[in-house]
């Protein structure tokens, strides 16, 4: 690519595309968020018009790990952590904690295709490692995947928020705290999708070599059945998405580079984590399922870091199905995510 990444021969670069996430408006235009602006494009992402989101922008700085959804009724909901209120990250090794760390999460919505935004609300003050997913269920509930840091010792936990009112108000789920010791420990950065039987399925990043899963039978209000999956994974987030074909699409960083089983481990010292783990972020792989995750196609690497890459990570992917079977993949444009913007086609992976 123009940024120095290797991409599979059936994958095409989309030069200059914003990082996303993207939603499609009722008239076919694209909408995303960048900085504190809502950006709208009528030419499939080549040029953009910007609208401010906040009446008082000095109080807000939207973190790059933002999430967006446009509901079937036309509401656009944005979930984000506010960097302007980020405070007190002071990891103390003797405590294995940062007791006063704060990075609040907010929701805000637009009812006029992004021109104006309303109903801004803070959902928690706790340190939010990342907000990673935002979906609408078949019953019209909006479910957002977030995080809340726990203390004594410091570790991360996952929570979701559910809105039955198109983003006007929210109910928090049980907090999923599976333990851990360290500033990158615990369960984190979950992705969520609805299964054919109506339940929600969550895949959580862990330091334990695989994604862990949970299920909810009540639109994300209560999560249960926490257990490891058989999907090997680095300590990095995946993204699960239901395609218009009905297949599930998963993109993630595998625990080991393709063809290797000797990737060096990190952590295990109780500072970053209590267990040594893979931080492999040099490749993004995809696979698809026709039976709600019971079986999957063989994983395929779609992009890889090279010596010439502008960034040495490819992680924190975003997925947008621009047209049926045409999937745009972007990474979170930052050092930890990399700078990938490509399109791939479902037909090439089934």
Regions found by a protein language model. Name each.
Residues 1-350:
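Asp-box/BNR beta-propeller blade signature and adjacent active/binding-site loops
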């Amino acid at each position: 690519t123009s940024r120095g990444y290797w991409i599979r021969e059936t994958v095409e670069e989309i030069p200059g595309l914003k990082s996303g996430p993207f939603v499609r408006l009722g008239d076919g235009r694209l909408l995303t968020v960048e900085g504190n602006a809502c950006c709208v494009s009528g030419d499939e992402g080549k040029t953009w018009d910007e609208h401010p989101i906040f009446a008082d922008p000095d109080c807000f700085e939207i973190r790059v790990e933002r999430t967006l959804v446009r509901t079937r009724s036309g509401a656009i909901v944005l979930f984000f952590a506010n960097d302007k209120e980020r405070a007190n990250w002071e990891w103390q090794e003797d405590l294995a904690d940062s007791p006063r760390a704060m990075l609040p999460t907010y929701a805000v919505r637009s009812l006029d295709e992004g021109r104006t935004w309303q109903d801004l609300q803070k959902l928690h003050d706790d340190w939010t490692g990342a907000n990673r997913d935002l979906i609408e269920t078949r019953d019209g509930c909006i479910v957002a995947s977030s995080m809340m840091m726990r203390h004594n010792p410091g570790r991360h936990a996952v929570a979701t928020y559910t809105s039955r009112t198109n983003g006007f108000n929210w109910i928090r789920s049980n907090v999923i705290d599976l333990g851990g010791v360290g500033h990158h420990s615990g369960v984190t950065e979950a992705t969520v999708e609805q299964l054919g039987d109506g339940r929600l399925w969550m895949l959580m990043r862990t330091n334990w070599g695989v994604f862990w899963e949970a299920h909810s039978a009540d639109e994300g209000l209560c999560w249960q059945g926490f257990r490891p999956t058989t999907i090997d994974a680095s300590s990095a987030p995946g993204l699960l998405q239901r395609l218009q074909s009905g297949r599930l699409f998963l993109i993630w960083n595998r625990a080991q580079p393709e063809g290797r089983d000797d990737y060096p481990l990190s952590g295990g010292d109780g500072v970053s984590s209590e267990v040594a783990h893979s931080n492999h972020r040099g490749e993004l792989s995809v696979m698809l399922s026709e039976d709600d995750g019971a079986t999957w196609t063989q994983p395929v690497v779609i992009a890889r870091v090279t010596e010439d890459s502008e960034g040495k990570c490819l992680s924190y992917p975003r997925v947008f199905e621009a047209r049926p079977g045409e999937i745009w993949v972007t990474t979170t444009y930052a050092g930890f995510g990399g700078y990938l913007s490509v399109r791939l086609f479902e037909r090439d992976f089934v």
